[in-house]
Amino acid sequence: MRRSRLRGLAAAMCAAVLPLVLPGEALAQMPSSLPPGPKVSIVSVTQPLPTQPQFTRVDVPYLRDLLKERSGGRIEGTVASHAERNLSGTELVRLVRSGQADIGASTLTTLSGDVPILDGVDLAGLAPGIGTARRIADAMLPVVNRDLERFGVRLVIIYPFPAQVVFCRQPFASLADLRGRKVRTFGNSLVDLVSALGAQPVSIGFPEVYSALERGVVDCAVTGTGSGVAARWPEVTTHVSNLPVAWALAGYMVNVAWWNKQAPEVRGFLEGTFREMSDKLWELGDAATRDGIDCAIGKAESCKIHTLATRPMTEVAATDADRAQLRDILEKTVLPGFVKRCGARCGESFNGTIAPLAGVRFGG
């Protein structure tokens, strides 16, 4: 009976939110005001750290300040990071489902423990550029929501962090040079990629990576360009690749029951907010990718978002051979590994939705 009720709520949610996810849909402008009505309080738990630009430049301005300002005080929001709530990120589906948060955000890799198909949106090597990553994200949003709705939640935005790249303690000139090295990874598809390169994947929590690199516990590590700079990795690494191996895509989700209780004008107001945030977050992900590299290599004139490294690194330019190897590993190792973990249905979803956009098909 409970499952039936959740499906009913999910169907109603689909009708209310679906316009947010249609590829190519013109973005609605956020309404400048709301008519008088009952006050709405919104609790949001979003980025891992309160210092991240996604939090300071998007979440706080929109989900706290602008909601109140543009709604004439009818909507009031509080925003906290995972760290401020002592969360790892894996709890977000359950947190939103239980109503402890109305809006939650986390990386798809983190959320995939509950919904395995989420891994397929951001497989290692799948999207060489951020434009492809966004087209895949837009197309997969309604697909993954069919699984998420079983939990009474629904994604309304998928957005990127800066490109995930390789930082190393010692020089390297190509992906092939990583053979034999110990590489910190996260998520199943990056483990598959690093293993296929002949390197040894090592799972280490992000806060511990700096000391692991410093002490030589790992030789290299994968993270976002800007994330590595923010964590002071240039102090303990010398070379950084500019080849995106993934995008650490993340998503904002809402509680379906909570959403359906809102008045139509409030839902419309929030839809406009999410649409505006989506554009800002994709623009930020694009700008922050190059900015992170420039800050890491000491290019002060173009380091605008992150902090300039005091110990400039060497940028390792991607080669055609690197790109070809990454695509080959995606086709032969990463994609089959994903389908094996997720099931045949995920392979069918991949071929039907992602393959036409990425040019890679499961099963050839």
Residue ranges and their predicted role:
Residues 11-25:
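Bacterial N-terminal signal peptides
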Residues 5:
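Binding-interface segments
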Residues 128-147:
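A gly/proline- and charged-residue-enriched helix-loop-helix capping module
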